Design a protein with these regions (language model features):
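Residues that define the transmembrane beta-barrel architecture of outer-membrane proteins
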Residues: 43, 65-71, 106-110, 123, ...
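Transmembrane beta-strands of outer-membrane beta-barrel proteins
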Residues: 43-49, 83-88, 112, 125-128, ...
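Outer-membrane beta-barrel "beta-signal"
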Residues: 283-305
Length: 305
């Protein structure tokens, strides 16, 4: 009996001494590989389009209170110091061209822009320049050019709970190339500069319904326009004005439906002063408060990621 017990103990001892060697011979599972770091440079191309019941630029109709369509193309180069971008966008417009209005009746609005943007945690910054080009303008008696550019800066802060705020500033040294209009009217040649600044706020609801995300947003701004030449040209009031909008948007994949109400503090007379329309055409609705529905499509593709 003792011999049997000793034999069992010896067998267990041999098995125990062999266990580490046996475990060492088992194949070991390799640790999961860490995901590769993002490339230091990456190119994205964003494209999109829009159809809307009216095209408003800071509260003023650009499509004669009628529907408008547009599209854009924007390559973005992501680098270690931020994203550099350039783009082109086009919109169908309809400036009233009857006698005395003073408009040059361009075929479209083409926006050519470029800049740099970056973010640091919740804070974002975007600076750039945009050219507003109006092709095929007609001579209106004093000018055939309304092209102008703006330099801009935008800041934003995301609180991380769906709520975000922002600030924008745009500057142009020659609004709508009015310097040529003033010169054509025999006024001292000068460039009417203008600064537009605004604040924005948005809230994105955390819940989705049928995979549709919802956001409410608004903007309040002021366009500060130099006045001396406007008054010499026959304007009866300061063309500067306050602008605002508030709305709700519903996004599903690449599609967004935006329902928005726009307004300014301009009367028909104030609007005529800003647009420099003839004295016989000062009753207009281009600056009236208005509800606009817009359907947008936005997508992007990465190259070399």
């Amino acid at each position: 009996m003792k011999k049997v017990a000793l034999s069992v103990v010896a067998a267990l001892a041999v098995a125990a001494s062999a266990a580490p060697g046996f475990a060492a011979d088992m194949p070991m599972k390799a640790p999961a590989a860490a995901p590769p770091p993002p490339p230091p440079y990456a190119l994205d191309i964003a494209v999109g389009g829009i159809v809307q019941t009216d095209y408003l630029f800071r509260g003023i109709s650009q499509s004669d209170k009628g529907p408008s369509g547009g599209a854009y193309f924007e390559p973005d180069l992501k680098t270690p110091i931020g994203t550099f971008y350039a783009g082109i966008a086009g919109y169908s417009i309809s400036w009233p061209s009857g006698p005395g209005y003073g408009f040059t009746d361009p075929a479209a609005e083409i926006d050519i822009y470029g800049g740099w943007r970056n973010s640091w945690g919740p804070f974002s910054l975007d600076i750039g320049i945009i050219e507003y080009y109006y092709p095929s303008e007609s001579w209106n008696g004093v000018t055939s050019s309304s092209d102008f550019y703006e330099i801009y800066g935008k800041v934003g802060y995301d609180f991380g709970n769906g709520f975000s705020i922002g600030g924008n500033i745009y500057y142009t040294p020659d609004l709508l190339h009015y310097s040529e209009t003033f010169s054509g009217l025999g006024l001292p040649s000068s460039k009417p500069d203008a600064i537009y600044y605004s604040g924005t706020a948005a809230y994105a609801f955390p819940q989705k319904f049928w995979d549709i995300s919802t956001k409410i947003s608004g903007e309040l701004g002021y366009w500060d326009i130099s006045t001396s030449d406007f008054l010499l040209a026959g304007a009866t009031a300061n063309p500067s004005y306050t602008y605002w909008n508030v709305g709700i948007s519903f996004a599903y994949k690449e599609l967004t439906l935006d329902l928005r109400y726009y307004g300014t503090d301009q009367s028909a007379q104030d609007c005529a002063n800003f647009l420099l329309v003839g004295l016989g055409n000062q009753s207009n609705s281009w600056c009236d408060d208005e509800f606009v529905a817009a359907l947008k499509f936005d997508t992007s593709v990465g190259i070399g990621h």
